[in-house]
Amino acid sequence: MSQVRSDKPFTLAGRTYQSRLLVGTGKYKDMDETRDAIAASGAEIVTVAVRRTNIGQNPGEPNLLDVISPEQYTILPNTAGCYDAAEAVRTCRLARELLDGHKLVKLEVLADQKTLFPNVIETIKAAEILVKDGFDVMVYTSDDPIIARQLAEIGCIAVMPLAGLIGSGLGICNPYNLRIILEEAKVPVLVDAGVGTASDATIAMELGCEAVLLNSAIAHAQDPILMARAMKHAVEAGRLAYLAGRMPKKLYASASSPLDGLIK
């Protein structure tokens, strides 16, 4: 019997996860759809935009944590909507206070509202402060391998290069840069942003990414629950394909049946 190549665990901040799909909570039509889509995705880590979502900072308003329980999911507060380092640091500290000392955060510092590209200068500033302040920082960044390396050297526990513009659904726009980042990686690399459908998630995993984080691809689908299920299987299939190792590409045909013993 052939040997099945074993997989290493997906571990972040000392905790191991079965699912390599991380999902967001924005853009759903209501809390019920949010809950059902996340459940269908099989995700164990759920990211929340602290500046846009109530997780306790607005008493009297619906609280997302009432439907996405911290007892069931790892809550990953993010700094979406922040445009400078100081703003991002304040948001992370607020999240830590609201979540009883929670240290795991997703840092994103945006450059402008049109592209939502990361401002890498402000991102590096914020990362340095947060790491020194004891946070476990997962960081949204460009697909520049040098910036990704610097963020890892600062002490970020994961780097999350964009595959395409946030919310664009363009897919994996520059797989070659991602491959360079992956070759040099000393920390987990997760694709963040740009995934539009299941095949995009599979490609990211086939490249060797540890995991995929997405939101719009599910929330904006015609059937979010069904797309959440598709993404779950896509990530699993991509990981298995990566472990299996794809066949080499060839310019010309190669017969799959042996030539020996042909009937003459």
UniProtKB/Swiss-Prot annotation:
Q: Which Gene3D superfamilies match?
A: Aldolase class I
The enzyme's first-digit EC class, named in words, is transferase
Instruction: Cite the binding residues for 1-deoxy-D-xylulose 5-phosphate.
Output: 167, 193-194, 215-216
The pathway that the record names for this protein is: Cofactor biosynthesis; thiamine diphosphate biosynthesis
Q: Which of UniProt's keywords are assigned here?
A: Cytoplasm, Schiff base, Thiamine biosynthesis, Transferase
Q: Which GO terms describe its biological process?
A: thiamine diphosphate biosynthetic process
Q: Which reaction does it catalyse?
A: [ThiS sulfur-carrier protein]-C-terminal-Gly-aminoethanethioate + 2-iminoacetate + 1-deoxy-D-xylulose 5-phosphate = [ThiS sulfur-carrier protein]-C-terminal Gly-Gly + 2-[(2R,5Z)-2-carboxy-4-methylthiazol-5(2H)-ylidene]ethyl phosphate + 2 H2O + H(+)
According to its UniProt record, which residues of this chain constitute the active site? 106
Paired cysteines (S-S): none
Q: Which Pfam families match?
A: ThiG
- Annotated GO CC locations: cytoplasm
Q: Which domain of life is it from?
A: Bacteria
Entry keyword Translocase? no
**Compartments where found:** Cytoplasm
User: Which InterPro entries does the entry mention?
Assistant: Aldolase_TIM (IPR013785), Thiazole_synthase_ThiG (IPR033983), ThiG (IPR008867)
Q: Which HAMAP family match?
A: ThiG (MF_00443)
So what does this one do?
Answer: Catalyzes the rearrangement of 1-deoxy-D-xylulose 5-phosphate (DXP) to produce the thiazole phosphate moiety of thiamine. Sulfur is provided by the thiocarboxylate moiety of the carrier protein ThiS. In vitro, sulfur can be provided by H(2)S.
| Quaternary structure annotation from Swiss-Prot or TrEMBL | Homotetramer. Forms heterodimers with either ThiH or ThiS.
Q: Write down what this protein is called.
A: Thiazole synthase
Q: Which organism is it from?
A: Ectopseudomonas mendocina (strain ymp)
Name the encoding gene, please. thiG
